[in-house]
């Protein structure tokens, strides 16, 4: 299964990356920061979830895990809410308006939140 994880360089995101790799999945990580993860089934991309025009088009994930977020920032709504919406709209759905439907490959979308990112 191909899993897309946003916030892949942070604590929860990095743990998710490792867990999915340990379970044999192909993982794509989005983050503004680099990662120390080196694995044949891992692809790390420096991506800002607030900027959907920067998203690569060739991913077709079956699972999306939205972990990316910032704390105590003027951008918290843009990153924590809009970023999650941007990624989910781009990879979990096809079509526009009333014709929107789930992407054929998508099986699950997981949105992670914490008290610090409220």
Language model segments and positions:
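Helix N-cap/beta-alpha junction loops of NAD(P)-dependent oxidoreductase domains
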Residues: 71-74, 118
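N-terminal Rossmann NAD(P)H-binding glycine-rich loop of SDR-like oxidoreductase domains
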Residues: 6-23
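Conserved Rossmann-fold cofactor-binding substructure of NAD(P)-dependent oxidoreductases
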Residues: 43-61
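A short, exposed helix-loop element centered on a Lys and neighboring polar residues
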Residues: 88-89
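Rossmann-fold scaffold of SDR-type NAD(P)-dependent oxidoreductases
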Residues: 6, 61-68, 108-111
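Conserved glycine-rich Rossmann-like NAD(P)H-binding loop of the short-chain dehydrogenase/reductase
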Residues: 23-37
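Residue(s) in the substrate-gating loop at a strand-loop-helix junction
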Residues: 114
